[in-house]
Amino acid sequence: MNKKLSFALLLIILVTASFFRVWRLDYQQTRTQGAWPTPASTPPGLFPDEAMNGNNAHEALGTFRTGEGFRVFYRENFGREGLFMNLQAMSMLVFGHTSFALRIMSALFGILTVLAIYLFTREYTKNEYTALIAGILLATSFWHVMFSRIGFRAIMAPFFLTAALWALYYVYNRLDSASHTHLVIISVLGGIFFGLGFYSYIAYRIAPLLLLPILYLLYKKAKKEKDSCIICLPAIYLFLAFLAAIPLGLYFVQNPQDFFGRTSQISIFAQPNPLKSFAENVGKTVGMLYYAGDFNWRHNIPGMPSLWWPVAIFFTVGFFDAIRKKYWLIPLWLTAMILPVAISSEGLPHSLRAIIMIPPVYVCAALGFYLIFSSVIGWFKKQEKRFADLEILLKVIQASIGTLGVVVLISAGANTYNSYFLRWAIRPEVASAYGGDSYLTGLFLKNAPRDIPKYVITSSVDSIDVTGRPMELEPILYASETYLPDPQGVKNIFYITLKQINTIECKKDCMIIPIDNLQPTLGALKKIVPDLKLCRADDYGLLVALPTARPGFKCSS
């Protein structure tokens, strides 16, 4: 393929990837008449896990400014590697204390992964067409778009691993070049990417297995050419990977209890029959691609397969084509990354835990697409010699088949747009899955008068956060910028449980926001503040209990 055409197509693919990952990622701060419209922000609200990341990022900004630096691990919410939160902290410096600042980092990694899969596929298969097809299929993948728009650290894993593998195969394919300077640079870069991957997601820890095929090829090449320093390049790669992973490794040595997180709690080894559970989980994860996807509204349209049915066909054909062509890395990658999913026993099928399977799935899909269309076009091309008088007709048929291929790729994007923006994003279940009114409550508190005491009441006893606060408060804490104790006092905001309502002081004025169990909470509050009125804020559509009516609220006794 012409290099200029290839570059132009790659640019179109990256623009497409950017559209699907960035469009409508900004947040609409108010809603109309208490009902969610087609949201200006997709996803709406902020999931507690995202908010916890944001609160840690806010905390990290403070330590960064005081010169204490960033943490490599955050123990809240079962523990998370710190790189993503630290990058989100840098994003907050640019975009402020917003949900966009948290999610734009995911979008950026999602876009970079599209570039990485193009580079890797081109290097591994040595086929420009297959590489471009892999790029456009990933750019328009509902599965990948979903996690490119949520502020979860796991989105980094596909990028770091794909980019790291690209670097090794790039080096291997150019060992005979006259100059090795650029190969040293790529080895350094690839090693850093591979090492940083350990900061992305716990499932990444199995990734070293994927280095074995290419390291073996490099070893064989080095044995043949003993006078060269071929072995130096993978040595540089591995050394840089080791250096990049050292801070996290040292943390785990000092804090071994954090190494497994909650893995042991959800492991199949806690089940009565682990082997049976493992087999069932493998079946569910494979089935997720074809007929029964993730049932969590946060990750998917419940039950919708992770692959659109034509892409599922391409994937199946491509998987066997990869084996036929001895592309052993692809089945190894899929097998290795299905293991972390299969040994867990919670919420399967689980598209988030399977996130590192995404690149090889779409490489297979690209292989299958190219094999099907190139074979059919090739067959008609061969007929030109047999039926010379039908040459024009046969060329028209070939062009039509090629056009059909383009239509299928465009349709994949249209299907994702329809599924994500028109079917999934507008559902009230999605708003509920992303915290419902929690983020709006935080924005309301942030903009409320500081001189009035504001009480947020919850009856939740869920204390996942090591600070002892329920996780459902995290979106409120993030949006109101009150995760740290000092801002709470300055802004006159108090977070209490139902058992602590006797601490409420509402002699002159106050605002009380019950975030769950509305009727029991109001009943208990009436005993303390008899004249309390239930009001709805005009701008936010939130229910707020007030002792007296105020402008901007519609109240009832």
Predicted features along the sequence, with ranges:
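Aromatic/acidic, Gly/Pro-rich catalytic loop(s) in extracytoplasmic/lumenal soluble domains
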Residues: 490-557
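Transmembrane-helix motifs of polytopic, lipid-linked glycan transferases
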Residues: 15, 104-126, 163, 313-320, ...
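Membrane-proximal, lumen/periplasm-facing interface regions of secretory-pathway glyco-
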Residues: 69, 394-478, 484-496
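Hydrophobic/aromatic-rich transmembrane helices and adjacent perimembrane loops
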Residues: 147-148, 154-157, 206, 309, ...
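Membrane-interface transmembrane helices that cradle and orient dolichyl/undecaprenyl
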Residues: 1, 164-189, 197
